[in-house]
């Protein structure tokens, strides 16, 4: 691991933003300014991804993990593990090479990699403040508590002896507050890869010195909608029909099963399709389908383990649509030449329900706090999903007097967690 360029002060503590899509490490000493620690080369963010190579036996992380997989190395690629916390999958094991591993162990392996980065930089690595969404699981307090306990257990098992949690939007508020010179009422909008969280927080330079800030958090709400859901619906609505979704059996009366296509459009479900049984199913469905050429494309994805490459092309298309009115989603490899033009209008139509859920949760935060939209002084946008134009408009249109603060899309939570760690442990 490369050393950082300057010396880390003694008494420096860490915050870890373990995200569905990307993760960061923030560090700060009590009374000092927080900063992000480079976690992959010079990069301040790392994709929350692992690749277990069957070729050399190594475990790769982040961009290197994605690259190994995309280049066709033999092994197992894992991403979006955070979205499994609190679900039934956490009680299952999955085959990695010749071993079966629990998903908690896989999450722990990524957390260990982050802890090793702290140690290599000379940061005290036995204590950490971990970020968490307002809701890991919507409308299920027991499952939500289980998810937090699972994440804490995974961290402790990898050497973080003292684990504390802070809500991710609150962490983003702490960072915003460090830049203020007057009191304000802020709405923190954090659209992450897997969750969207909203907090109404009273911020001021004076209150920043208080140890207990609970009275300043007027409301926190959240919904299990994030950037990967936008990818999934874009894929289901516009891409998967070209791979068989919505097709009929040859009798013209019955639709083909949909679960294969839903899984292929969902990052953390794609690996479950790479089995001999699913491949046999695809061959059977090809023979029985009215449009076998579509199923032939799907079979190619399974046979050549190309599902994540297609999902990556969909995600890249979504990102381009933040600036462009239309884009092409392309997957061109031996045996499959797929290209599809998608407009921003079509993307927004496919994801309208997701935007509606975000708007409803935002309105709930204001109602729970007992404040009007006119009373909000600033809205802080963070998380990669906040870059989507329809989301940005939905989050700001109803706040007529609020200054829109577009913070570091991927770094503000990690910086706030570092501030919180310095306050708690310093």
Model-identified regions with their sequence ranges:
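Short, well-ordered loop/turn and helix-capping segments at boundaries between secondary-structure elements
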Residues: 236-245, 397, 401, 419, ...
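Intrinsically disordered or highly flexible coil/loop and linker segments, enriched in small
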Residues: 90-91, 120, 124, 244-248, ...
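Phosphate-binding glycine-rich/basic clefts of nucleotide- and phosphate-handling proteins
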Residues: 45, 202-333
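Conserved Rossmann-like nucleotide-cofactor binding loop
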Residues: 21, 194-196
């Amino acid at each position: 691991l490369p050393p950082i360029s300057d010396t880390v002060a003694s008494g420096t503590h860490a915050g870890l933003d373990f995200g569905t899509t990307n993760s960061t490490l923030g560090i700060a000493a009590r009374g000092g300014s927080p900063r992000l620690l480079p976690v992959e080369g010079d990069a301040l963010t790392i994709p929350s991804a692992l690749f277990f190579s069957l070729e050399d036996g190594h475990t790769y992380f982040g961009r290197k993990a994605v690259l190994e997989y995309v280049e066709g190395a033999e092994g197992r690629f894992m991403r979006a593990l955070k979205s499994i916390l609190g679900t039934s999958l956490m009680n299952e094991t999955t085959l990695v090479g010749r071993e079966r591993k629990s998903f908690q162990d896989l999450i722990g392996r990524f957390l260990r990699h982050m802890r090793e980065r702290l140690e290599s930089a000379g940061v005290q690595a036995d204590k950490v403040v971990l970020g968490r969404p307002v809701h890991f699981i919507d409308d299920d307090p027991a499952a939500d508590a289980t998810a937090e306990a699972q994440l804490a257990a995974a961290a402790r098992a990898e050497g973080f002896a003292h684990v504390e949690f802070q809500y991710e939007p609150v962490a983003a508020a702490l960072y915003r507050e460090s830049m203020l010179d007057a009191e304000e009422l802020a709405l923190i909008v954090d659209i992450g890869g897997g969750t969207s969280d909203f907090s109404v927080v009273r911020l001021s330079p004076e209150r920043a010195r208080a140890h207990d800030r609970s009275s300043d958090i007027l409301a926190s709400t959240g919904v299990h909608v994030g950037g990967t859901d936008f990818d999934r619906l874009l894929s289901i609505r516009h891409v998967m029909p070209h791979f068989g979704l919505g097709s009929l059996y040859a009798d013209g009366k019955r639709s083909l099963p949909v679960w294969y296509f839903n899984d292929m459009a969902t990052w953390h479900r794609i690996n479950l399709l790479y089995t001999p049984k699913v491949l046999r199913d695809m061959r059977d469905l090809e023979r029985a389908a009215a449009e076998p050429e579509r199923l032939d494309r799907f079979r190619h994805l399974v046979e050549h383990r190309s599902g994540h490459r297609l999902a990556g092309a969909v995600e890249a298309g979504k990102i381009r649509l933040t600036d462009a009115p239309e884009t092409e989603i392309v997957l061109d490899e031996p045996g499959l030449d797929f290209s599809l033009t998608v407009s921003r209008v079509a993307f927004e139509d496919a994801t309208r329900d997701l935007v509606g859920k975000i708007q409803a949760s935002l309105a709930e935060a204001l109602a729970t706090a007992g404040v009007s939209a006119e009373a909000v002084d600033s809205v802080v946008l963070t998380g990669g999903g906040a870059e989507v134009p329809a989301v940005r408009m939905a989050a700001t249109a109803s706040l007529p007097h609020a200054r829109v603060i577009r913070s570091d899309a991927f770094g503000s939570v990690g910086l706030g967690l570092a501030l919180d760690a310095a306050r708690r442990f310093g």
